[in-house]
Amino acid sequence: MGMVIGIDVGGSTTKIIGVDKEGIKHPMIVKAEDPITSLFGAFGKYIYDNGISLNDIDKVMLTGVGSAYVNQPLYGLSTDHTDEFLANGLGAHYDSQLQDLIVVSMGTGTSFVKVEGGKNISHIGGIGIGGGTIQGLSRLLLKTQNIHQVVKMAEKGVIENIDLQIKDICNTPLPGLPLDATASTFGKASSNASMEDVAAGIIQIGRAHV
């Protein structure tokens, strides 16, 4: 059995792995604005960095929103497509060995997939908040989408200056909610908030939806 390459062409990143009889090999993430550029760049870098010959590859499987743009061979290799939600469900089942679970896939946005009995897989919903939200707000409010820079700024910020917390509206904890839990994201933000405080609020959005 040769290697099967799996590629998830997402909205902001492309993820790629190889699978052979020994298991999963060399996961890689490549970022690019254009999904086609990201796909071909990720695949070329993957096989080069890992010393993989095209002759070693039996199949290339594509998924993700960006894979819809691909309807031709990849470096001469035929490609097959699979549903992203099915891939998420099967992958989580394989990795966890659980028969019944809810899979939360946090990418550019966030989706929820239900797995029943290890084989019945269905998409049950999602929210339009994810990594793309963090990047977009950072571009608008901080004039950068460099996540490392945003995190450094957030470490110096004070979230209490940005988010309305339970303690701001109630003097006792609510069941399951500590006083420092966020009641309203950016609910206390003022026009003179520091950039560091704003960064803390943006990062908190991601944390609040984990």
Per-segment meaning from a language model:
Residues 2-8, 59-61, 101-105, 126:
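Short glycine-aspartate micro-motif
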Residues 3-41, 45, 121:
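Short glycine-rich, Thr/Ser-proximal phosphate-binding strand/loop in the N-terminal lobe
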Residues 8-13, 65, 104-109, 128-131:
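A short acidic Gly-Thr/Ser loop motif
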Residues 30, 78, 120-127, 135-140, ...:
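Flexible, glycine/proline-enriched loop segments at strand-loop-helix junctions
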Residues 43-58, 200, 209:
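Phosphate/pyrophosphate-binding loops at sites that engage ATP/ADP/AMP, CoA/4′-phosphopantetheine
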Residues 70-104, 109-119:
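Conserved phosphate-binding catalytic cores of ATP/NTP-utilizing and phosphoryl-transfer enzymes
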Residues 139-207:
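Active-site rim beta-loop-alpha module in soluble metabolic enzymes
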